[in-house]
Amino acid sequence: MTSPSVREWRDGGRWLPTAVGKVFVRSGPGDTPTMLLLHGYPSSSFDFRAVIPHLTGQAWVTMDFLGFGLSDKPRPHRYSLLEQAHLVETVVAHTVTGAVVVLAHDMGTSVTTELLARDLDGRLPFDLRRAVLSNGSVILERASLRPIQKVLRSPLGPVAARLVSRGGFTRGFGRIFSPAHPLSAQEAQAQWELLCYNDGNRIPHLLISYLDERIRHAQRWHGAVRDWPKPLGFVWGLDDPVATTNVLNGLRELRPSAAVVELPGLGHYPQVEAPKAYAEAALSLLVD
């Protein structure tokens, strides 16, 4: 690992042992409720590093899901969003005292909908007060999947994973940023290093199974968006080519009362492209 930004992020965190592997966790003190930041695919909690300074004294905790970032990346392993939700519960139990609010991006939005469903079932072991979903294809049939996502889900997925290169990753990753806020060379290098940590660049075909879970558990997770009785809002980069405004419109149909902050001119990674605007939008929905 050579990027100073990655080393600094790693050195400020710790690893929490779990039954399935060590999970990287970072947290900071501040006012409650604690803000839980959940990342997406194929990146990590590193995505939120520039958001955290704008949280205006709010307590926060973030983690790398199993198989991502600086967490362990076992293989073979049947990766599941249900397991990731269990790991969130473990991290919260070891890190947080008191109430929690969630800010979730991309894949993390589906982990969050499972947490909402567990709360509806009376099975969530922590006090979740509010949630914000951001640029996640919760309603998969409304999303515009990238070609590499389709290949990784296919029988050719293991072959495609072995062929992943830094150049190919950088080109593909860069296409989901907005033209006004392009992917920088430094960000691309850091993201590639985190992907490759613990040979993670060899398992994207295993991790991509979360898309199938979005179909399998659609009734449960869409129902949670519709029926969860606490404040739920959406923060959305409107120039996202993957989780497009078509997804956002579907979420609005599921939950017409939801508060929405639209971020024009931002792509799939609004927290990287415009961290201050993203943080302010999230805080406006999560903190009284």
From Swiss-Prot:
GO terms for biological process: acylglycerol catabolic process. This is Putative hydrolase LipZ. The keyword Transmembrane does not apply. Coiled coil: none annotated. It is an enzyme of class 3 (hydrolase). InterPro entries: AB_hydrolase_1 (IPR000073), AB_hydrolase_fold (IPR029058), AB_hydrolase_sf (IPR050266), Epox_hydrolase-like (IPR000639). It holds the Pfam family Abhydrolase_1. One of its GO terms (cellular component) is membrane. Its EC number is 3.-.-.-. Gene3D superfamilies: alpha/beta hydrolase. Belongs to the AB hydrolase superfamily. It comes from Mycobacterium tuberculosis (strain CDC 1551 / Oshkosh).
